[in-house]
């Protein structure tokens, strides 16, 4: 609750913005279709599957796995008369809390100790990646909770409390797997153990076979219905296996998971605790001082089957693990939690004086230090960097519904968005349906322009790189009719009157210009200067092999005293001597506090030993305070030699 409260009404941003916005779009779709559960829809008229957004279906209905955890928030949205995301956040968060309550009950049964059970819950809840998604939008969190509830019901059945608890376990296992089919793995693990018990004549087959049969019939029926929707309407949700193409790719993915995601899955304190309980459990077994409570031993079979199934799923979906950290929650998270509980169950109850109190202090200490690491992880995850265009799109489209309405765009008009970062992201904010075009090549953009739409919207900060650089003829196809700080609203161009790029983007007259031609005195402060070998009357700037940072500028006066965003146009010539990477860096900083950072690669847009003249338009975000300095420099980490000439920095108000 502490981590989630201040983000309770936040639209999905930062990590997996795309996936989480897709879930919010489903909830909004149910609100729009009067809560028709069997026709889930979002905002997209050209779906990702099967034709990769290239086919306009003109229907927003999309196939998706049993979207009950998108539907329930929609019911409350409809009842409260609002689509604000806090309803979705609160639903997922409350579901997770219920799951942890049952995890405590389950762990207490397995471990036979309230203190050990509390440690298991703290271990689970303090996972950095779990905490990030705990109040989010993914169905993984409710499915984790339902699986834990199912395991607790199974534990009651296992203790001999009656057949009804097995049926409740079937219900919650089915409910978990319906929303996220990956959770069929723990279901199968439990059924596998039940088969062993049946063969050993410790459980009966016939009393439960009907319940299991009905459960799988429901699961297969749901999958069949989803496949029919997919065949008829298409889908924006993955439904195929994505194994690694070869052993080398698998090894690279494992390396990335180790290097990048290891401490996202669990903190260093988690790994230490796992190591500690394994060592203590082994010692307890060797000296025969282990817990004499035997009922938990059957859980080791379930844990083994579960981990085996998770590993098999990893091989089947290796590429998704590379790009989607929440797949860890779908697979390995709960069996690891169960493994820790089982190791703790082996440990005997402390016989020394105040033993339970000392254990409770250790549990409290673990909770404090692990939550501190998790808190730092949450802060790092929630930082906006300029190359995160998914979060940038959320920011750019904020308030777009009102902007479009004031510009005369009806709520029934169809919108085209070219080069979307997460197809549903702009349409959620615009509250309108439309076409999402990837826009990676001219054919893709031409195709989108040929469809039936009323208006097209571009993101101003990304227009130059994402649209104009790929398709400069766009100025002949559409004309700008309204512009705000982040968006350009256009309609089809019906005349042949030319329009300039600056007019199209509504970038007006400059208010400050800084020129560096390496001839005047003020040009000599930033860089070494030498005579141009090709022209006796010209001097050029020079960045040597040992200059990691060169041509540095700090702009404070030029960006003005107010905190609003600015547009910076950088124009200049450069020549590079070798293949070492060079790039432009633009940043807002105050001491060591970095608020904004953007890089522009120069190596990929130039040829060796040839002068290249380029112009870049950078949309600078609002500053947090007047103390932030705008910095510009050329980054040369790989010992290149770079020549520069005739640079100009022009500032515009946004």
Could you say what each language-model-derived stretch is?
Residues 394, 402-442, 455-460, 490:
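Short periplasmic/luminal acceptor-recognition loop of GT-C membrane glycosyltransferases, typified by
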Residues 153-161, 173, 185-217, 283-293:
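Perimembrane helix-loop-helix junctions
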Residues 207-279, 308-315:
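Membrane-lumen/periplasm interface segments of specific transmembrane helices
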Residues 13-14, 325, 358-406, 421-425, ...:
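Membrane-proximal, lumen/periplasm-facing interface regions of secretory-pathway glyco-
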Residues 171, 212-217, 343-378:
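Signature aromatic-anchored transmembrane alpha helix within multi-pass, membrane-resident enzymes
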Residues 140, 185, 321-348:
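Hydrophobic/aromatic-rich transmembrane helices and adjacent perimembrane loops
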Residues 119, 124, 168-173, 213-217, ...:
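Transmembrane alpha-helix segments characteristic
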Residues 132-143:
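Short acidic/glycine- and proline-prone juxtamembrane loop motifs at membrane-interface regions
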